[in-house]
Amino acid sequence: MAQAIIGAIAASTAGSALGAGIQVGGEAALQSQRYQQNLQLQENSFKHDREMIGYQVEASNQLLAKNLATRYSLLRAGGLTSADAARSVAGAPVTRIVDWNGVRVSAPESSATTLRSGGFMSVPIPFASKQKQVQSSGISNPNYSPSSISRTTSWVESQNSSRFGNLSPYHAEALNTVWLTPPGSTASSTLSSVPRGYFNTDRLPLFANNRR
């Protein structure tokens, strides 16, 4: 009887120990599985973030390259050379020249533009002065005399002829480049591209340093 009781107790204890061991082993396996799942999840999340950052950097580079290419194309269409267009896109100073209109950006490949949209600026054409006709009788009004009407008609005809006949947008000597002599220069040329008869260059400050 006592042996049976001791055997039952021993069997119960052994079963409890075996069950506890199985439970501990199961929990350890479950923890290991959770750890591997978390590790894989972190790796996938890091990989996803790295790919997204790479896509963002690539998209930003493509957008920047497109914007720079657009600016370069616009500058080239405006007449700038390839070197000046690239320098302007990069933020560097471009080539500038001095002419009779002042300092301007060099755009040798641009088409001539004017202040009038859709047409050219008319160049005044001097017309021969006409002698005033002397009226033999009556009260003469200079504002309504035949000579005034004739001058008005001649002026309108000259404007029409200059607008449709002369297609030059500038004066013949307006775009000639002038190279000024710096104050400390000893080897610069003093030749001007425009005849001295057009401008009194002796009284202009820009020509104060020209050697004679």
Curated annotation (Swiss-Prot):
Main location class: virion
Coiled coil location: none
UniProt KW keywords: Capsid decoration protein, Capsid protein, Host cytoplasm, Virion
One GO cellular component, as annotated: viral capsid, decoration
Pfam (any one): RNA_capsid
Location relative to the cell: Virion; Host cytoplasm
InterPro entries in alphabetical order: VP2
Note from the entry: Translated by a ribosomal termination-reinitiation process from the bicistronic mRNA coding for VP1 and VP2.
Domain comment in the entry: The N-terminus domain points away from the virion surface.
Assembly behavior: Homooligomer. The portal-like structure consists in 12 copies of VP2. Interacts with capsid protein VP1.
Function text: Minor structural protein that forms a portal-like structure at a unique three-fold axis of symmetry, following binding to the host receptor. The channel formed by VP2 may allow the delivery of the viral genome through the host endosomal membrane.
Name assigned to this protein: Minor capsid protein VP2
Organism: Norovirus (strain Human/NoV/United States/Norwalk/1968/GI)
